[in-house]
């Protein structure tokens, strides 16, 4: 009986073959490689600190499907490469260093077809000492984090720059009215409110600028000028105006993607304590928050 059942099962199972599995996408690399470089010009020093990630695509299928590591570039080797090229090539321009890394991996490893380099900069400012900036002492600069994303192929290179984690706020010149109202709506309309957001913006270069860092600074300045000086009827409208300002300021970029989470500042109810709150005291909240995103292009 057991033999009969086994034969019966094997005959039936032959009709229901499990389809072959295949690997449809892969990449790998080294992440969170931190480098800090000191530039010395006499007694005056400057520093640049980056967190780098390198991801490779190419002929690595066998390492996943056959445990064949012969073409695998060890991630420890990637780390060493980043450190070496930082010593040799890292200067003021984050994007130039990313391009150098991408070019190196494509030139050195013929089986690599695509290199994605992510770079996040940790900015430093000079510590005031004796009424002037100190020559070689620094503190963390601001809240914004500049970053870059470099994609290199054998056909071309793509450079994207941006900033993230920039908390900006205006105490007036902002409102929100005439929005859709239905049975789920409780939000009151207003023509005067606090507008606060943690800005993230990334712009794509269509050609190389004279200086990536100066261009990035001008783009951010243009967007912040709109935020500060223009009345905001909604985060959506302000996002679009900021994107247009970026494109107008820098003709070398093709588009800008902006994320502006609406970090609500809620008026504190002081009436139980016999006090009136005339738009003076708020509770800033991170969640839940409105998530406003948009891309503006030419």
Language model regions located:
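Tryptophan (W) side chains
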Residues: 6-9
